[in-house]
């Protein structure tokens, strides 16, 4: 779902679409990030027909500025890529998406969660009876940031692969 398609959500639902992915961080020019007011608008529309919003959760402002700062500092090592996309930017975006989903009663999926702390916001919302779901990816459970120096660009993804302690906490959430 991009800003230009928000007015067509009902039409897309009638054609069989029941879930819509949004980027609340920068993705690329073809899939611009959805500003908060547009995310709220999309959630309001989707909640009316019982659909789901799936969110790529990273704070666009933090990520774009931190990435720029890291480049200016000369940080180029793959193992330090996560510093330009800090875990707190993912956690904040998750908390914001959860808040909006509570306001509008929209089912929410947090896509490819990499920050273990982000799970807490979703668990609390579920305890309160909200339909908030999460998924992670195998690479977040198998690799930690220092392995990126071996793998190089093959391991570059967003949200990024994080330090080892995060991997261990993410596994704790998966197993419990």
Predicted segment positions?
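Histidine/acidic residue-rich metal-binding segments in metalloenzymes
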Residues: 4-176
